[in-house]
């Protein structure tokens, strides 16, 4: 038996089976044990191959591709610690729903737990984080091609959310051999190779989807009540639909930075601190939350404390998604589908004073930030930097909170992020995947520690199919800890950890454009030129370390003193 040839036959069938379930992008790291998978991917005309030398970044590249394409994306890595490096991206996908297929090459069973090189226990390595796991046997002609393709079809049909881990042991040799061998094994599938459908067309009915989505029987009753809408993470079209729907009902909509609703009541993180605004919201009889991953501290505090008669949470992702554990209903379905089944009825707005508090908060922001070139000012004016027909990727930590609190993004403008586990690892890689999936002009904004954490992902940005700007807000450390009651004496050394770096040489190292503007007009002009010029440019904005956190705290205090508005 020519082991190397049959390994490749096995891998070719595996990759072809995945394409029948919509896999179009595949991300590949270098490695020898994964050779059968890599060669099969390279030879498959249905696959677009992406490569990266760092498996942690590779996993996040796939995550970004899956986010923006809404398609399942496959990843190939070799055995050993290369597999473990996929963990952060897998965890994020499990929380935010992107479908990843992790193809992890492995040593055969006889090389495990005996001191063989680069051999670790890969089965079950990811514990409960994958949605599904398949441990394939070592390739052998004794196992039919029908078994392999049916196993893969069954797993892919069940994958509605999160990651599928397929562990793939391969014995040596991995190279050479007569390519004509074992053609009969592949040919046993007949004309399937010329088809475009799965071998096994398995239909899965998750519990929430046994029947088409039915309208809530008492919706016509509740839509006549005083309601509040909370908008978390959702798609661009869903955000537009929700904004119009809430406006017709006359219900206030509190939109997260990721909601793509246009945040009709901007600066919610500020005005929600006003006692009178809280009193108004307390009159709500029903709260409807669409999407999860809320950013605002004040919104989360209000969401936890509110006690409406009913609390409904609508999101296509499974699970509870409500850490406050409200009494009410958890409806698992796409936001747009729910809205179409639950029409709004035009009603007079019941909480008009909230708009006044929002306008006052926004005016306070404009006054406070006037003439500043600061982290807070960039967050407030970020919408002015967005490219036409483009997209935005927002990092984690302090910057996303400042944009949420001080900015207002256009309704329906695509916004992406990693707000499942909210880590700062892999943000540049994820942004690269988002850009590759859509080929749209892309603005990505992250902090300096996030950029350092994923610095070698700048290699992924060298070849972009549309203009890309990476905006690094350098506040010299993790200044989000300045918002928290961390011990002052230990804050800098053990929490913020300032690194005293600039990113000019990093940009040069990876052949990227670079700019370091010193004013808002300079920043705006640099970004505008980037959209015209193309390629990728790293723009570094150096700001005083704690100014962003201090400005946010100052504005919260100022807004609480806004005079009470008559209802």
Swiss-Prot record:
Parts of the chain that traverse the membrane: none
List the GO biological process terms: menaquinone biosynthetic process
Which pathway is this protein assigned to? Quinol/quinone metabolism; 1,4-dihydroxy-2-naphthoate biosynthesis; 1,4-dihydroxy-2-naphthoate from chorismate: step 2/7; Quinol/quinone metabolism; menaquinone biosynthesis
Q: Which InterPro entries match?
A: MenaQ_synth_MenD (IPR004433), MenD_middle (IPR032264), THDP-binding (IPR029061), Thiamin_PyroP_enz_TPP-bd_dom (IPR012001), TPP_enzyme_TPP-bd (IPR011766)
Q: What class of enzyme is it?
A: transferase
Q: Name one Pfam family in it.
A: TPP_enzyme_N
Query: Which GO molecular-function terms appear in the entry?
Result: 2-succinyl-5-enolpyruvyl-6-hydroxy-3-cyclohexene-1-carboxylic-acid synthase activity; magnesium ion binding; manganese ion binding; thiamine pyrophosphate binding
Q: Which UniProt keywords apply?
A: Magnesium, Manganese, Menaquinone biosynthesis, Metal-binding, Thiamine pyrophosphate, Transferase
What reaction does this catalyse? isochorismate + 2-oxoglutarate + H(+) = 5-enolpyruvoyl-6-hydroxy-2-succinyl-cyclohex-3-ene-1-carboxylate + CO2
Cofactor section: Mg(2+); Mn(2+); thiamine diphosphate
Q: What does this protein do?
A: Catalyzes the thiamine diphosphate-dependent decarboxylation of 2-oxoglutarate and the subsequent addition of the resulting succinic semialdehyde-thiamine pyrophosphate anion to isochorismate to yield 2-succinyl-5-enolpyruvyl-6-hydroxy-3-cyclohexene-1-carboxylate (SEPHCHC).
Can you state the subunit structure given in the record?
Answer: Homodimer.
For this entry, the protein name equals: 2-succinyl-5-enolpyruvyl-6-hydroxy-3-cyclohexene-1-carboxylate synthase
Q: Recite the lineage of the species.
A: Bacteria, Pseudomonadati, Pseudomonadota, Gammaproteobacteria, Enterobacterales
């Amino acid at each position: 038996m020519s082991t190397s040839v049959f390994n490749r036959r096995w891998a070719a069938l595996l990759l072809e089976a995945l394409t029948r379930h919509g896999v179009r992008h595949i991300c590949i790291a270098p490695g020898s044990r994964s050779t059968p998978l890599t060669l099969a991917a390279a030879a498959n005309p249905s696959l677009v191959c992406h490569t990266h030398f760092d498996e942690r970044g590779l996993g996040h590249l796939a995550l970004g591709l899956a986010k923006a394409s809404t398609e399942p994306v496959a990843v190939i890595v070799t055995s050993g610690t290369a597999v473990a490096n996929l963990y952060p991206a897998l965890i994020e996908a499990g929380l935010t729903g992107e479908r990843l297929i992790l193809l992890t090459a492995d040593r055969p069973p006889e090389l495990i737990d005996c001191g063989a090189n680069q051999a670790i226990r890969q089965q079950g390595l990811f514990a409960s984080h994958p949605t599904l796991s398949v441990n394939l046997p070592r390739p052998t002609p004794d196992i039919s091609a029908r078994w392999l393709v049916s196993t893969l079809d069954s797993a892919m049909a069940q994958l509605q959310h999160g990651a599928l881990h397929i562990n793939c042991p391969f014995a040596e040799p991995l190279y050479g051999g007569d390519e004509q061998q074992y053609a009969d094994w592949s040919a046993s599938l007949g004309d399937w190779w010329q088809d475009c459908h799965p071998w096994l067309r398995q239909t899965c009915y998750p519990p929430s989807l046994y029947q088409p989505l039915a309208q809530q029987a008492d919706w016509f009753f509740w839509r006549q009540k005083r309601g509040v809408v909370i908008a978390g993470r959702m798609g661009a079209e869903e955000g537009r639909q929700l904004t119009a729907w809430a406006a017709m009902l006359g219900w206030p909509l509190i939109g997260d930075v990721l909601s793509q609703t246009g945040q009709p009541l901007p600066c919610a993180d500020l005005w929600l601190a006003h006692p009178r605004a809280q009193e108004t919201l307390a009159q709500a009889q029903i709260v409807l939350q669409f999407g999860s991953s809320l950013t605002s501290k004040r919104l989360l505090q209000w969401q936890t404390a509110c006690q409406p008669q009913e609390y409904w949470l609508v999101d296509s992702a499974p699970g509870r998604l409500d850490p406050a554990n409200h009494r009410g209903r958890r409806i698992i379905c796409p936001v747009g589908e729910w809205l179409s089944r639950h029409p709004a009825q035009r009603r007079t707005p019941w909480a008009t004073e909230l708009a006044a508090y929002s306008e006052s908060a926004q005016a306070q922001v404009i006054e406070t930030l006037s003439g500043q070139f600061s982290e807070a000012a960039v967050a407030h004016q970020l919408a002015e930097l967005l490219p036409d027909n483009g997209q935005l990727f927002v990092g984690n930590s302090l910057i996303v909170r400042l944009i949420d609190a001080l900015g207002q993004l256009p309704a329906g403008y695509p916004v992406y992020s990693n707000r499942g586990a909210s880590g700062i690892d892999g943000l540049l890689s994820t942004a690269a995947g988002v850009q590759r999936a859509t080929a749209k002009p892309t603005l990505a904004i992250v902090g300096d520690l996030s950029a350092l954490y994923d610095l070698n992902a700048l290699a992924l940005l060298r070849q972009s199919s549309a203009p890309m700007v990476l905006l690094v807000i350098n506040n010299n450390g993790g200044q989000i800890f300045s918002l928290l009651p961390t011990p002052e004496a230990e804050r800098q050394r053990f929490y913020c950890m300032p690194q005293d770096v600039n990113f000019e040489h990093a940009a040069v190292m990876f052949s990227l454009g670079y700019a370091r503007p010193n004013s808002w007009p300079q920043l705006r002009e640099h970004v505008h030129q980037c959209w015209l010029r193309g390629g990728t440019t790293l723009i570094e904005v150096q700001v005083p370390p704690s100014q962003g956190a201090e400005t946010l705290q100052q504005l919260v205090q100022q807004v609480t003193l806004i005079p009470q508005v008559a209802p």
